[in-house]
Amino acid sequence: MSRSICTLTCILPTFSMDYWNQECVELSQVENLFTELASRLELLEMNSKNVLYRLTIGTNPDRNWEAIAFIREFFDSAKHGYVIPKHEIRNRIRLLSEASLISCLRWLLHRIPGGVITWSTYKLFDEAETRANYPVRGFDIFMKHATKHSCHFNILKCFLKLLMSLSAKLAVSSNSSTVSSLELVSQIASIWAFDWPMMNLQETFIYWDRCTNACLRLLLCYIRYTNKSSETGFSCLPSALQSQLQSFNYPPSLKKLNDAKAHVFTFSMNYYMTRDPLEMIQIVTKMNIPDHLTATLPRSSDDIQNDCLFALRQVSKRSSYHSVFSAQESAWTDFIKNGFDHPILPTCTQETVYSLLTGNDTACVYPFPNKPYRLPDVDFEIFSHCSFESLTTVTTNTNIWWVWAESRCTEIPESKRTVFPNCTMLIDKTGRLIILQQTVPQKPVALTASSNKRKNRIFGKIRRSFKRILKPRKINKTVKIMSNSQRRSCQSVLSEGNRTILLHLADQMNACSLQTKSRESIKTLKLIEEKDEYWEPETAGYFNTIVGWADQRKSLYDEAVIKINHSNMLNTLPPTSQGATSTTVSSASSNFLSSSCTPIDDTNSVTGSTLSCSFDEMKLSDKIDDANSLKDDDFIQGSKKDFFEMNLNHSSYQNKDELKPFQLLVKHAFKPPSYRLIRPPLRDWQSSDTLSSEMSKSISSSRSSPFSLEQTISKIQNKL
């Protein structure tokens, strides 16, 4: 009895670093990038009234894909010590939109160790300049010695030059009616210039005052150093800055910014820490508070300034945004209602799925609102655990609201979100600053029956979605070869959707099913025996491949590489030893990475970026060797197999009448999926991974999201 062996090997790749989520950067590596970004931003003509809003608030976080792709591409190109030429960086930056340009610059500002200036550098400069009696060229002389490296000095110069340019644009803005634009820019830039430790509110206001005075002094010192007169004796500075400089002496006197009163409303909840500013406002407006304090706090959204409320909506989108849901386009119709559909405020469903994906089972028990463009209707359960604590008055400045908004930007790494961690700032119609602060919960409380029931419903909905996707319709016992439409029914849904989320979520669901508290909610996804006559063998192998692959997942953003040994290599394969560990699986399941499957002429090769493959016609018996198949208990315990092997018996196919519907390998070839059907994976997205160079060049500047290629390409074709 002769046997042929077809080996399907799943090779997990080496995990590359996600450059966007790194905590800090090396100055020598980003010097040229920072210089070109700052220079480009200076040249942009921005409306002076929107400068502060664009710098601190930004755009919707689901449009950050351009900045994320740019940062990842830059660091990936600069690895192994390669220095990207300045002209190449400049050409790449010119293609960025204004929002992406600001996002990339803000990303760098928040990842420079110790801030752009750092306190050690400022103290050395202050001491040297004071002893020298403040010479005009003091910045160029003393700052070079205060900074440790020339790259730090160059970045600091570009930073101050950018602040000077923004001050000139803000000089005619209505936002700077109470203070000069130089002071206003220094107040906002304080969060970029220095490192901010964890402090309480009053200490934060004092620290902000200190940072602002240091920024203002360095900015005036730089302007004083660069203020060179022309041949006719006139200053080269903008006229708006010249008029402001007349009101400043050097060195400037220390100013107390905290000269206004603000109300701090403090409340507590026993088990829930809110992260959304709109949700916090809704909690306060619905909370029972003493009658004599109702006039002090806003009781509805009408009591908040329109501009402030609009900005809070943007901050709310950023606060509730998880990187896990960045795809936001799923091919699974009604997978989870609003689960991946442009999340604006966190929902209980999103938090449950997010907790599964991250392995944290504590975040999914809290009720969350789901009203996108207005103040959310918070679950009534949440108010039963809210309690009013105090209403106090602090001395601060209204402009610190811009610093608070900047502290909520998506570009700040999670480990550095130490500024205003538990509060929301808003401005009412009278122009008063109101601070809503929540105390840290002390201990969790037991879940109510309704919360458990809600969680079980979500788990059941997730599982039903898995069953609908992974178990296509069964076939009859009559002889029938797998058609293209049936193959697509069990492949295209996963390949066109967020397949990585599905794989990882399946793994997390199996892990949760082992827990006592989740056994009634989640049933383990078990392996299917391929000899079951009610299952298509191809579908069974496809299902088992997904379940086995989900058990081997190490990262959400890495794709496994599938290596296929073709039929012309079968004779050269070594025989399988009885002691080797292997798993029976259908080789046709290897095609599930294709978005479309269309029969074409035969081919015997797999090219680098395409997903085409060919198989010689082989016949398979109705009894498939399942001696090496995985047991359910082994999979639940996390057993991992390296190779998938399948023994095919040709001798049992002497008679064609014996052919059963369990034929796994047929003579098919699949052409690469068309551009219209491709959806990029969830991992680090790059246009070159999915599109051809010509296609990438034609649509790179026009699409609004890498996950809406189908709409973008159709629009381009309609225009042509």
Swiss-Prot record:
Protein name: Meiotically up-regulated gene 8 protein
InterPro entries listed in its UniProt record: Msb1/Mug8, Msb1/Mug8_dom
Any GO CC annotation of this UniProt entry: cell division site
Encoding gene (name): mug8
Presence of keyword Cell cycle: yes
Name of one Pfam family that matches: Msb1-Mug8_dom
Function: Has a role in meiosis and septation.
UniProt keyword terms in alphabetical order: Cell cycle, Cell division, Cytoplasm, Meiosis, Septation
Compartment annotation: Cytoplasm
Provenance organism: Schizosaccharomyces pombe (strain 972 / ATCC 24843)
GO biological process entries: division septum assembly; meiotic cell cycle
